[in-house]
């Protein structure tokens, strides 16, 4: 594998990783802007842009976009997160130029016709309704709200239904003009790709995109709190979040290992103690989410109403115990899981393109796989205990 990056004159970064023995290419544009860059007034616009990107440009209708990609057997998709937005395609290697052309078209010449806007507003409102009927979605949205109350990072990615219903096309144009600038976009491809050819495509299709200043985001502070909601359900859905670490913290990798020890699989402490030993739940897991300046460490479980009083103390006790008695065999097992996951992801060009893009947006560079493995291997028992202590005593928790 050969990984390369070139920065165009306007600031747009072009990244590629050429892989031997493959016939396909995954290519996408990642934008350093997501839901946390919204205001209360335009909450939901980043997600609406993701929906509207495929609904027509100056030269292509929504049907044209779908037909062109699917006529060559390609797959087109997008997603919105709190910090980033991505638009990506997977195609046969000979169709890379078509993919870049379509990506450039939808990101620079989308028309956001009112008829399409009206239909897509209705679709997103249905998506919001479906989310509100899905306990897993509700619990994590409410947890985010109480973790970061009255802050952009705490607001829903989908936005409120009433805000979406009133959102006009000018809101989308304004958000794109402010945030979709060359210095905040990167074009990334992995698979059967020639870097020089990709750079030439980027120059031709994105070279006139204006550089633009980097828009500062509202710094977030984890504050904690509680959200309770009664519904007619079979289970109590419980989630606990604690202040955690940003991407650039020295304990970022120890936190990933610690999370795996605590709730990262069937051998994890939470799974063994809560499910296997006590039978208190079917689903229990934890994960660490890092942002640019902060983070959240989350534990989730679903249980019966009669069991929640026993479940919560057990979860809290397991979290607290980890800072004092994390064992070397647990650390070894967690490191092996993380290393295996890292190496297995290399087998997918789409996963690899995603990794390279995210690393560049977050760290400003592509991290060699060998370095990732070294950093995981460097995490020892003392580091896991230390980071468990940092997180468990880091501040007021959030509960939903």
What are these regions (language model features)?
Residues 1-24:
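N- or domain-start disorder-to-order transition segments that initiate the globular core
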Residues 247, 253-266, 270:
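A conserved active-site cap/scaffold subdomain adjacent to cofactor or substrate pockets
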Residues 40-44, 98, 119, 250-253, ...:
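A generic structural signal for residues located within well-ordered alpha-helices
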Residues 7, 15-18, 62-217, 228, ...:
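Charge-rich, well-structured scaffold segments of protease-associated domains
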Residues 21, 26-90, 264-280:
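M16/MPP (pitrilysin/insulinase) zinc-metallopeptidase core fold and M16-derived inactive scaffolds
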């Amino acid at each position: 594998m050969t990984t390369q990056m070139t920065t165009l004159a306007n600031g747009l970064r072009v990244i590629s990783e050429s892989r031997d023995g493959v016939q396909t290419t995954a290519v996408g544009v990642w934008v350093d802007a997501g839901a946390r860059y919204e205001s209360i007034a335009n909450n939901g616009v980043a997600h609406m842009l993701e929906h509207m990107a495929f609904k027509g440009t100056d030269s292509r209708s929504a049907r044209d976009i779908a037909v062109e990609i699917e006529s060559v057997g390609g797959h087109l998709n997008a997603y919105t997160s709190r910090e980033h937005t991505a638009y990506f395609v997977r195609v046969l290697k000979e169709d890379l130029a078509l993919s870049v052309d379509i990506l450039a078209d939808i990101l620079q010449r989308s028309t956001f016709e009112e008829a399409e806007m009206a239909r897509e507003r209705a679709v997103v409102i249905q998506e919001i309704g479906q989310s509100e009927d899905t306990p897993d979605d509700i619990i994590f949205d409410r947890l985010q709200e109480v973790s970061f109350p009255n802050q952009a990072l705490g607001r829903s990615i989908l936005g409120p239904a009433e805000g979406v219903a009133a959102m006009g096309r000018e809101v989308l144009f304004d958000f794109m003009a402010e945030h979709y600038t060359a210095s905040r976009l990167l074009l990334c491809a992995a698979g059967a790709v020639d870097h020089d050819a990709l750079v030439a495509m980027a120059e031709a299709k994105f070279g006139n995109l204006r550089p633009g200043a980097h828009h500062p985001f509202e710094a977030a502070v984890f504050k904690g709190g509680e959200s309770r909601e009664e519904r007619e359900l079979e289970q109590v859905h419980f989630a606990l979040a604690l202040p955690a670490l940003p991407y650039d913290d020295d304990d970022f990798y120890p936190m990933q290992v610690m999370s795996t020890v605590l709730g990262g699989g069937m051998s994890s402490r939470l799974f063994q103690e809560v499910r296997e030993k006590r039978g208190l739940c079917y689903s229990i897991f934890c994960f660490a989410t890092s942002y640019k300046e902060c983070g959240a460490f989350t534990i989730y479980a679903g249980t019966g109403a009669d069991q929640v009083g026993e479940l919560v103390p057990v979860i809290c006790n397991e979290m607290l115990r980890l800072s004092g008695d994390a064992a070397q065999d647990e650390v070894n097992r967690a490191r092996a899981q993380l290393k295996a996951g890292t190496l297995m992801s290399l087998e997918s060009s789409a996963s690899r393109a995603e990794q390279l893009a995210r690393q560049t947006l977050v760290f400003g560079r592509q991290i060699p796989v060998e370095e990732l493995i070294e950093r995981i291997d460097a995490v020892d028992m003392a580091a896991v205990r230390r980071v468990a202590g940092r997180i468990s005593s880091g501040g007021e928790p959030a509960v939903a």
